[in-house]
Amino acid sequence: MIVVIDYGVGNIASVLNMLKRVGAKAKASDSREDIEQAEKLILPGVGAFDAGMQTLRKSGLVDVLTEQVMIKRKPVMGVCLGSQMLGLRSEEGAEPGLGWIDMDSVRFERRDDRKVPHMGWNQVSPQLEHPILSGINEQSRFYFVHSYYMVPKDPDDILLSCNYGQKFTAAVARDNVFGFQFHPEKSHKFGMQLFKNFVELV
């Protein structure tokens, strides 16, 4: 069973629909018991970093999530804002992140040659060989909507990069923790492949 963390933030219905399409048994829940019994976890999120972290903390789930991810080593996928929340902090606010990956999130600088937020389809470039990237290559396109991007302290944590007037991190991976800046649930066949890979991770 995959549990999509339901803390009131994120495209939960879209994520569940995509998981259903790849044949996964999944549910949205804010129950500690469900989280403890889950095989894998997905942390969705949209909006501002501080609001997301405050809402997650008010849900009372941070401790059980941290136990399941960092001690029990359950695979977790952070999506969009959820990926940034895996890190230490964001320039967007003052709230501390979950700290599961040593990284910050920083804002794209405004320039004449690009708009902020970065919105729309963009190609990604794999930086690591990993089972979660099976079938994903330089031709794979994903849907982005974001003004901030992840900056891991360790370059070996960069799973995918992307170019938007500069090279930036589109996805991170450390052990059982995965973060995707784009919206795989809105990325059609490429997003479906990514969810399929996550479901099949051992």
UniProtKB/Swiss-Prot annotation:
Top-rank lineage group of the source organism? Bacteria
PROSITE patterns this protein is in? GATASE_TYPE_1 (PS51273)
The biological processes this protein is annotated with in GO are: L-histidine biosynthetic process; O antigen biosynthetic process
Could you name the Gene Ontology cellular component terms for this entry? cytoplasm
Q: Where is the active site?
A: 80, 183, 185
Which reaction does this enzyme catalyse, per its entry?
5-[(5-phospho-1-deoxy-D-ribulos-1-ylimino)methylamino]-1-(5-phospho-beta-D-ribosyl)imidazole-4-carboxamide + L-glutamine = D-erythro-1-(imidazol-4-yl)glycerol 3-phosphate + 5-amino-1-(5-phospho-beta-D-ribosyl)imidazole-4-carboxamide + L-glutamate + H(+); L-glutamine + H2O = L-glutamate + NH4(+)
Q: What InterPro entries does the entry give?
A: Class_I_gatase-like, GATASE, Imidazole-glycPsynth_HisH
Pathway in which this enzyme or protein is active: Amino-acid biosynthesis; L-histidine biosynthesis; L-histidine from 5-phospho-alpha-D-ribose 1-diphosphate: step 5/9
- Name all Glutamine amidotransferase type-1 domain ranges: 1-202
Alphabetically list the UniProt keywords.
Answer: Amino-acid biosynthesis, Cytoplasm, Glutamine amidotransferase, Histidine biosynthesis, Hydrolase, Lyase
Q: Name one Pfam family in it.
A: GATase
For this UniProt entry, the molecular function terms from Gene Ontology, in alphabetical order, are: glutaminase activity; imidazoleglycerol-phosphate synthase activity; lyase activity
Q: What is its EC number?
A: 4.3.2.10, 3.5.1.2
Q: Which SUPFAM superfamilies match?
A: Class I glutamine amidotransferase-like (SSF52317)
Which locations, inside or outside the cell, does it occupy?
Cytoplasm
Quaternary structure, from the entry:
Heterodimer of HisH and HisF.
Role played: IGPS catalyzes the conversion of PRFAR and glutamine to IGP, AICAR and glutamate. The HisH subunit catalyzes the hydrolysis of glutamine to glutamate and ammonia as part of the synthesis of IGP and AICAR. The resulting ammonia molecule is channeled to the active site of HisF.
Protein's name in the database: Imidazole glycerol phosphate synthase subunit HisH 2
